[in-house]
Regions:
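Conserved short strand/loop->alpha-helix "switch" segment adjacent to the catalytic nucleotide/phosphoryl-transfer site
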Residues: 28-55, 76-78
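Short beta-to-alpha transition helix within the HATPase_c
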Residues: 1-27
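Conserved DxG motif in ATP/Mg2+-binding regions
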Residues: 78-88, 120
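Conserved NTPase motor "head" modules and their coupling/switch loops across ABC/AAA+ ATPases, GTPases
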Residues: 20-32, 40, 67-72
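C-terminal beta-strand of the catalytic ATP-binding
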Residues: 119-126
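Short beta-strand/loop element within the Bergerat-fold HATPase_c
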Residues: 68-78, 111-112
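Conserved ATP-binding N-box helix of the HATPase_c
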Residues: 43-70, 95-96, 100
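ATP phosphate-binding glycine-rich loop and adjacent ATP-lid/helix-beta elements
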Residues: 54, 58, 88-119
Length: 129
């Protein structure tokens, strides 16, 4: 559906991440999701962000017992924060970042006191927004 439209309601991304958080909890990982979304966002950026989350989760599933997602979307930006309990510092590979960076997004990571913090920010609209 996303590939056939240029813009999506931000609630579609919110609901997708919420369902993913519920699915992760089935595997014994404490997973919380908070959001504040409004407006429409680029379908291409939605796909890239959800792909990023999926690959990230696959990498950390076996080395965490708690995840926190915080999604904020408004007419200008998509901000995603992920906090992950992890005894091992995880480096996010360049290929995982490629789709986000190609779309003008920024990803930063910090590791402190057994917690990995991931911050993703990108414009919410298309290339001209």
């Amino acid at each position: 559906m996303a590939k056939s439209r240029k813009m999506l309601n931000a609630f579609e991304l919110e609901n997708s991440i919420r369902e993913l958080a519920e699915y992760i909890s089935v595997y014994g990982i404490s997973c919380s999701f908070f959001s504040n979304v409004s407006g429409e966002i680029s379908a291409e950026k939605t796909i890239a962000l959800f792909k990023f989350i999926g690959i990230f989760i696959r990498h950390i599933m076996n080395c965490t017992d708690a995840l926190l997602f915080n999604l904020k979307v408004n007419e200008r930006f998509i901000d995603l924060k992920i906090n992950c309990d992890s005894k091992n510092e995880m480096k996010i590979s360049d290929d995982l970042l490629d789709d986000i960076i190609k779309l003008g997004g920024n990803v930063t990571t910090e590791y402190d006191a057994d917690t990995l913090f991931v911050f993703v920010r990108m414009q919410s609209g298309g290339d001209d927004i």
